[in-house]
Amino acid sequence: DTDVKIVLQPNPGLIDEFNASTGRNCQLPPEGSYTVEGTEVIIDAGKSQSSQIKVSANSDKLQEGVSYCMRVSITSVEGGDLKVLESSRTAYVMLTKVITIKAAYLARKGCFDIPSFGGEDSPVKALGQMTLEMKVLPVSFPTSASSANGISSLCGCEENFLFRFGDGAGNPTNKLQFVKGSIGAASHPDKKDHYESWVEKEFETGHWLHFAAVYDGQYLRLYLDGEQIHFVETRNGGTINLSMAYDGHTWEDTFAIGRSAGYARFFDGYISECRVWNVARTTAELEDGICYVDPTSEGLISYWRFDGETQEDGTVLDMTGHGHNAKPYGDITYVDNQKCPF
C-alpha cells in the first residue's frame, strides 16, 4: 500500500448543469469572496479518507438570501492504482451568508393580524396552488395538554388551514399539528375536503424550525426544515381559502399569526420569515429560502420578516409591496442576535 496524492482545483465555470439537475438557482460566488487553502489532499496508506482543505468565505461580499455554489474538481491522482470515477470528479461547495437579525417574541401575550386577507377581494380566497411557510423558535410549551390552553397557534386560519403545537385533546403540547387542511371546489372552508396531519416528533424549546405546506393543485405536501415529511393526494383538487377563519362563534375572522379561535391559544416563542405564495415551491426552493427570499419573487403574495423594523402605525411591512402589512395585537417584543442558517 502507498499514499495517494490528489490534486484539486477550484473550477468557477458555469453551474447551469448543477442548477438544472437539482432544481436550485445558485450563483457563482463573487470574485474575491472566498479562498481555498491548499490544492492537495493525501489518503494515507491503509486509510479510506483523505486529509482536508479549507474553504473560507468573506460574508461582506455575499448577499443575504443568495445560495452560492463553487465547483471543485480533481485534476490528478498520484500513487496506488486508484482511478477517478468521472461522475464524482467534480464536487460542489455551497456557500450561504449567515444572517443575524432580530425576531418577534410573542410570549403568549401577542399576535399579528392580516386584515387585508379578508373580504371578497382577498388575494388568498381561491388559491389553486399555494405555499405557506414560517420559522419559529418555541420558548416554552403549555403543561395542560387536555384543554384549549394547551394549544400554541403559529399561523393560518382556525378550522380551515392552521399550523399549531398541541390540540387541547390530550396529545403532547410540543407536537406540531397541521389542522383541517381544507381544500376543494367549494368556497367555504367547512364544505371543502380536509387533510390534516401530525408531525410525528416532539419538539424541544430553544431551537429554530422551519415548516411549510405546499399545494400544487393535486398533492398537499408538508415540510420540516426543507425536508418533505408528509404528502397526500387530494380527492378532487380544488382551491385553498385563507381569507376565512372561525373565531369561536362566526367565520368573520381571517388569517392570523400567533393566535386562533379569536384572540386565544397564543404561542410562547420567537417568529420570523412568514410567507404566503400562490405557487407551489419546490424542495430546493424551500431549502434555499429558509433565511430569506427576494421580495419580488414570482408568486410571492406576502412576506413578513418580523425583524424589528416596523411602520409608523406599528405594523410589520409586507416586503412584497402588496400592502398586506401585519397588524400587531397585545404585547410583542423583539430579541436580538438570531442567526440563520440555524
What are these regions (language model features)?
Residues 89-107, 292-342:
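Extracytoplasmic low-complexity segments
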Residues 130-140, 265-289, 302-310:
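Extracellular, beta-strand-rich glycan-interacting domains
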Residues 246-272, 287-291:
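Extracellular glycan-interaction patches encoded by glycine-rich segments
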Residues 116-132, 199-207, 264-270, 294-297:
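Extracellular/lumenal carbohydrate-interaction signature centered on repeated Trp-anchored short motifs
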Residues 225-252, 288-291:
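Short, solvent-exposed beta-strand-to-loop segments that form ligand-recognition rims
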Residues 96-106, 137-139, 168-239, 332-342:
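Extracellular glycan-interaction surfaces
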Residues 1-101:
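Short boundary segments that mark the start of a structured unit
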Residues 99-180, 281-285:
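Extracellular glycan-recognition modules
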